[in-house]
Amino acid sequence: MSVLVNRFRRNGDTLAVAILIVFMFVFYVCWAFHLPSLFAPDETMRMDVPLYIFKHGCLPRGDDPEIINRFWGTSYGFSVYGSSLFAIPFMWASELFGYADITSLTIAARISNCVLAAINLVLIYVISKQLRFSKFASVLSVLLLGMLPQYAFLAAYFNSEQLEFLSTSCVIVACLNGKRNCWSYGSCVAVGLSLGLLALSYYFAYGAIIAAICFFYMDQALRLRAGNFSHREKMVELVFKPVVVFVSSMAVCGWFFIRNAILYNGDFIGMPTSSKTAEKFAVTELKPSNRNTLKSQGYPFWVLFKQPFYGIYWPEWVYKSFIGVFGGMNIFIGETYYFLYSNFLLVGLLSGVVGALLICKSKQLSAFLIPPMLMVLIPVVLSIYYSWASDYQAQGRYVMAGFGILSLVTALGFDGLCAGVMVLMRKDSAIEIRHVIQEEMDDSQMMPIDELRIVYRRNKTVVLLQGILVLFYITLFGIIVTRVILPSCFGGFV
């Protein structure tokens, strides 16, 4: 019995996370089966691409009449569609079991999204372990993401966001692994493959590419400065290994951009050609030339934060739909629950930011806060520009690429608050902030940011506090499910 107890103490967090992920995956799948298609934004238009691939066994042109939307005059075949490629095996499996109608194939594509969401939760846990989080913080980081209403909603229907979240987490895991292994060739290949996957996910995730480049060169610069490297070795580290990363990423995503460039006269992104196609085939009011964007009306971009447009105040709608707005942006969870969610997350996030700044107060460590900040902020900047210059879309899903990082920081913040409670109590409790340094590291070398951890002796009061935090978040999600999701968004697939 004592052996089992000790084993549970050592691996209790892993078991808890496994149970949590399985539970959330089952919930995502159940919702995917029962979410009406009218409540799944853009799903019908986005499904045209995987349905075309399934039917014809080849990739579509973006301007193929079979997939051009009759209202918008364009298709998702111009932009990256990694999520469609991931859905195809699930659609084949559905056909294998005798379900090849449109409804069954759509559900199969939705299930592929549920799988992506569950794998992403696993990666968030892996990242927390790479960062040497406590068991409580590791479990909480997965819980915060998996039970965020908007994340659950995005897992329940076919979209590009879940692959965006997953690929961003893959980049983080690969970069941390590369740092730990001094950017071995295998690590560089892993970073390249993850960046290639990210490039096929969604344009709003591309901030992670810039963040990964910054992380690589900052770590390499510090490592090379601390060590005794020859000129040739420095060239290998700073030039040849980035080439390995680039080639590896192109092996995954290069075909798409080369194909686009060939098909659309050098337009490897596909956006300009998509706009030209929309100008030609869209209904009159939806043609790009007839859209009154804020930019075309002469407004500066910051006007989004000063006044509402079209009855929508951009910051408010982004904030609410970041937490949870379902259907066609018309099913809200209620002001009380927005208040509870936002304040709960804000307390943990602010505490986590303060804790990270305190831990990384040396200049060398502070520099490593830049890449995660870029991952969080660049999607926000892209969303602001898109709403200002192209299409006024105040949607939280466009800025969620970095929420995995925010969930980790928030979990770290709550962990720090619990540690602070122990310091204040001063009863049979101690806090030890310990820097785990690589063996034989001299004082001139950088202290690894991914090897900082807070170790403390637990007591009953702190365990109770941690339990209350977890129970509060689970209860809040349960209330949203019973009062909003089940009555409004669980009406059976149509």
Please report, for each region that a protein language model flagged, where it lies by residue:
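Transmembrane-helix motifs of polytopic, lipid-linked glycan transferases
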Residues: I107-R132, C170
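Short acidic/glycine- and proline-prone juxtamembrane loop motifs at membrane-interface regions
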Residues: Q150-L163
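Membrane-interface anchor segments at the N-terminal boundary of transmembrane helices
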Residues: S104-V115, L304-V376, L382, F403
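Perimembrane helix-loop-helix junctions
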Residues: V3, N177-K179, A208-V247
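Transmembrane signal-anchor helices characteristic of membrane glycosylation enzymes that use polyprenol
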Residues: G12-T44, L51-G62, F71, V244-I262, ...
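Transmembrane helical bundles and short interhelical boundary loops of multi-pass, membrane-embedded
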Residues: F256-F257, T336-F339, C418-V494
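Transmembrane-helix signature of polytopic, membrane-embedded enzymes
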Residues: Y99-T103, I124-M147, L166
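Membrane-lumen/periplasm interface segments of specific transmembrane helices
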Residues: M218-A221, F240-L349, R483-V484
